[in-house]
Amino acid sequence: MALTDESLRRVGSSASEVHSESVVTAETSATGLAFQERTAPSQAVGRPNLPTENLPRRTPPLLWVSLLLSAAVLACRALSPAIISLPSLTPPPEASLISTGEGMLARLDRLGGTPCPESDFICVTLTVPLDHLDPADGRTIEVVFAVLPAGGDRRGMFVTAVGGPGGSGLAVADTYTAAFDPSITEAFDVVFFDQRGLGASGGQQCVAAAAANYGAEYDPLTAAGETELALDAERFARDCPAEMGNPDLLPYLGTEQAIEDLEVFRRELGDDRFWLYGESYGTQFAQTYAAKYGERLAALILDGPVDLTLSGFEYYAEQAAAFGEVLARTLSACAEDEACLGDMGGDPLQAYDSLAARLRAEPASFEFPLPSGRLAGRSFTFGDLEAGAASYVYSEGSRMLFLRALAASTRGELAPLARIAYDSLSLDPETLAPLVDPGWSDAVSFAVECNDYDYGPAETYLRAGDAVDASVPRLGSVFYGDLPCSFWPEDGFDPGRPEPLVAQGVPVLVLVGTADPATPLPNARRIVERLADSYLVVQEGGPHVVFGWGNACVDNLVTGFLVRDLRPERETSCYGTVIDDYVPLPPADAADFADPLEALASAETEIAYLPEYFYWDGETPFAVGCAFGGTLAVEPSPTGEAYTLSGCAFSRGFEMTGTGAFDYESAGSRLELAVAGLRPGELVYNRDGDGATRVTGEYGGESIDLSR
């Protein structure tokens, strides 16, 4: 489905071995100033039609972000003995090599492999049939695969199909792989690819059409709103193919064609069988491949799976309900946290519903701090609220960020929610112009969806949404994400739904979180029930797509399954949470800080929680307007990151001007600042890699030397 994939940055961390005792106690500890991991919520569905963007998920930059919070101890509790060792899931090692004995580097060289840009991977461009299903059609298309050869004794090939549809595998290959246990990259040639039509495999885009589509506002609960919704979907279905530049590709971008490209790649590499991992939409791809070429799979991993037997209407109805439920669970988790509840000033669910009702009635005017230092008059709408809410319920970290922004709104500050909305809608916060992400394609996203699913005419789609509108109180508009398919060109045939996946002779590991809004838990359970050799791993709470986030239970089960042929019990439960530990908002007035050390530590935390920084790529310089005036600029440095502050204030009365740095090697940070406001001063702030802080200098006419 066109799932609003998080594809989510993950912090790769070494994980302890999963224990084989009957029960492993599930405990966690997490304290500190900031957050444990940087996640990237996707461009999500919060309006009737929002970007379904698949962003990089495993973290490159800002190691200090995770260092500010003590690492949580993520344990695993199996329903019965956690791991059992069975005979090898794969043929003997030599069977995975091509018959000529040719090594991987030699194979890649034979296929014209070259280094992928700014990557450790080797890129191979294959020319494949445009229409695999019609041998008489001689047209071709190029598809790019990226391979990281095994670092040790080769076991075989491990292929990842990323989420979307529309997400680039090449764009995330290095960051995903950094989160793997080293034993995976030692044993496997790791493979990612750009699906036909997107990124390096075609570059098809429709950025302007998508921006217009996602920026439209209407209420599907009213007749007039339904009319506008349908008109906008029709307009997008016309404008997107026209903008993409090669609309003739549209009939050939579906999953049924795309899996044939992978099969061509397998044949060219010469492996008889390989290991396939799919996440979110990638599970749609992986199951389609497994249904046709199951004999070519040594094992299959489905993370955040889609039940392909459901119709589009059935799937989206279940998904819309899940989005609303995860939002409610997020708000309930806030109510159980003293600091979050205090910041919210009352019941968090009521805070959200009250704001939503107010914005439904009338957009709210507010001033947004620009990177230039000026304030811009802006309007915050109900659609903006839903965009941010839907986008930011994908992971524990993003849910906590949304709660902080919602709490700020209860004290009259809408700019934090606006930052989240702009990030969710891929808008430049200063100009509100659409941002181009080369790792994502709306054109391919809808082309795949509209090839894979049949919805019939728009009226049928809208009437199918009536039950959702009546039963889902929050974020039900997610249901309408595929409405453009009712108008999509080259549509008009019903692909039908596939038979349930059998995967005879293929062990299947299925992963899911109980707080997954995009691919709700029932999908995974139904898939597992139909498979004879399948194993379900359920993380309590957790994100959408659970492998690679640093949860030792989940990651070790996957690593053992891949590297050591270890199969878990039929169902295993792993510890997890709905939200990361809540970090309180700073006081609005600097007079409420105990001392300048507390003020500077708070400022460092606030920088970390800016969405522009939270999802920074670590390479592109950027600037933001600070909450109470001034600006902050961030850029990479030879040893880490460099900051420039100019009158920047996150609390009234504590304006900071100067420079700062974060050093990747030591994991320490430093700020050298002149401060103004309540008291003038010249301060130097240091935080070491262990989290100890110190400030020295002069403040309010007095020398200070404070440490904690």
Language model features: what each stretch is:
Residues A415-Y453, A458:
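Long, low-complexity segments enriched in small/aliphatic residues
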